[in-house]
Amino acid sequence: MYRPRVLLAEDHAETAARLRKLLGVDFDVVASVEDGRALVDATERLSPDAIVADIDMPGVDGIEATTLIRHRDPDARIVLVTVHGESMLVEAGLAAGALGYVLKDTAGDELVAAVHAALGGRQYVSRELGVR
C-alpha cells in the first residue's frame, strides 16, 4: 500500500525525532532537515507529497520557506507546526500558501489529520486556534 511521502523541517533534534515517530505511523518520512534553506533544496530534490515545517528555524524561517516553495510549486502541500498561536502568524502562514497550521503542544492526532487534509487539498488549523 502506498504511503504518502513527507518531508520534515524542524531544527530541534528531540522535537524532530518525536514528530518523525508520530508521522511515521501514517506516512513515509523521506527526510528531516534543520533550516528553511535546506527545506527548499530538499523539496526540489525529493518532491515529497507533503511537507511539515516548523516556523522558527535558523536562516530562512518556515513561512518564508513556504513562500519560496509555493512560488516554485503552487501545488505543494505544506503544514506548519509551531508553538506560536498568534492570529497574525496563522494568517501569515496561510497567506504564504500553507494548508495547515498546527500547534506543537497539540501535535499528535491533529498533526496527522492536518497532513491528511493537506494531501486532499483542504485547509486545517488547530482546533485550539478556533479557525478551520
Question: What would you call each of these model-derived segments?
Answer:
Residues 48, 62, 74, 94-99:
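As written
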Residues 54, 82:
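Active-site residues of response regulator receiver
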Residues 35-38, 58-64:
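Acidic catalytic/metal-coordinating carboxylates
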Residues 9-10, 33, 51:
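Conserved sequence signature across two-component system core domains
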Residues 88-95, 100, 105-132:
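Short, flexible helix-to-coil linker/hinge segments that flank and couple to helix-turn-helix
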Residues 46-52:
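Active-site beta3 strand of CheY-like receiver
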Residues 12-31:
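Two-component/phosphorelay signaling modules centered on CheY-like receiver
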Residues 41, 63-75:
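Short amphipathic alpha-helix used as the core "switch/output" element in two-component signaling
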